[in-house]
Amino acid sequence: MASSQKLWGGRFTGATDPLMTAYNESIHYDKRMFNADIDGSKAYAKALEQRGIISADELDKMLDGLEAVRDEWKTNKFTLQPSDEDIHTANERRLGEIIGTGIAGKLHTGRSRNDQVTTDMRLWLRDELDIIQKSLVGLLQVFVARAESDLDIIMPGYTHLQRAQPIRWSHFLLSHAFSILNDLDRLKQIYSRVNRLPLGAGALAGNPFAVDRKFLQKELGFEGVIMNSMNAVADRDYVIEFMFWASMVMTHISRLAEDLIIYSTSEFNFVTLSDAYSTGSSIMPQKKNPDSLELLRGKSGRVFGNMMGFMVSVKGIPSTYNKDLQEDKEPLFDSSKTVLDSIQILTGVLSTLTVNPENIAKSLTADMLATDLAEYLVRKGVPFRETHHISGSAVRMAEERNTTIDKLSVEDFKSLHPLYEEDVADVFNYESSVEKRCAIGGTAKSCVLEQIQTIKKALE
């Protein structure tokens, strides 16, 4: 391709190697930012008119032309040309065809693709964050609804994947919901740092025509202006921060997916996935595979890889803009889509999930109440370290007799400590056990209801 067809072609006399042209272009993935690019150009055109760089008539033509370009993108009528290196060159080329290059050529006055591209990215990401935030709220609402409807189901709580203590199923769900609620809070913080204006920074040294950056800030809805022009064009912290956030939320999604995969197995059978989020086997007719959950777990690694790959790309580049920064877009776009899809899939899984209370109840075992047995003596003044040992001795006694601790007699317990009395049998009640965990954050019904209200209030 002749260099004269390119925005930067005046310096060059030779044609670019075709492979280099393909290697250099980004239009096939950054074209999704067409709206952001047009919004940025419209605002910049207005700033140029304010400074007398273009006339009011030229501004009107630019604004109308840019809207015509936008309409072509929206209606899939925009035709890409070989010279369209990226979304910025494509839009400027098409604008020139519509209103003439004499006017369109003034649009880039004082503007560099360096400040243009990062403005587009911030505008695009800002819109994505709004969509993701709404999806997170929807997911949390499903968590709350399920926690309310399943409040009376008591299940084994696990540590080290070993049965530990009885808890409410709702308490388990809300443990994951609070992680997602923290993700929502972090997302709001990220938004404020994304929502800062780089436009008007030029290539690196600033704008030579004194465009009003405060006007650009208000026109494009940014919260503030990036005060250093070099930082404005070089900064990709907001990309990395979003990808870190995406990795964090995918970690939380993956951990819940793993729990539900385990609980959906025939060995547990605590839950049954809806057919809408399951698949079968090509050879084994009886299979119902939790592919939705496995993909949620698997795609977390994809998002982690996007973050690490881009961090490696930027860790050693010198100041301001370098072409390495073009590698920010594909991982950003992919992480955003993957996270949004994952949130929506998890929302569907949870809203259609069938809980099997009878199977859950069958999994409750008396040994899970060994701590309660120790606490029985604590309430009578015996030090916990001593009661822990005594309760452990009761567990061992039951194992040696090939029975469970709730089958031991009062005399058996008295042989371990004289303060055990007839009411020790009351220890072996799962409902009573969970209701004792009544400090803030516990699994008692009152505490779980308080947790539900906390999340509801946070979503107001």
Curated annotation (Swiss-Prot):
EC number(s) on file: 4.3.2.1
GO cellular component, one term: cytosol
Keyword Lyase: yes
Keywords per UniProt: Amino-acid biosynthesis, Arginine biosynthesis, Lyase
GO biological process terms held by the UniProt record: arginine biosynthetic process via ornithine; L-arginine biosynthetic process; urea cycle
Active-site residues (renumbered): H160 (proton acceptor), S281 (proton donor)
Superkingdom of origin: Eukaryota
Protein name: Probable argininosuccinate lyase
Species annotation: Schizosaccharomyces pombe (strain 972 / ATCC 24843) (Fission yeast)
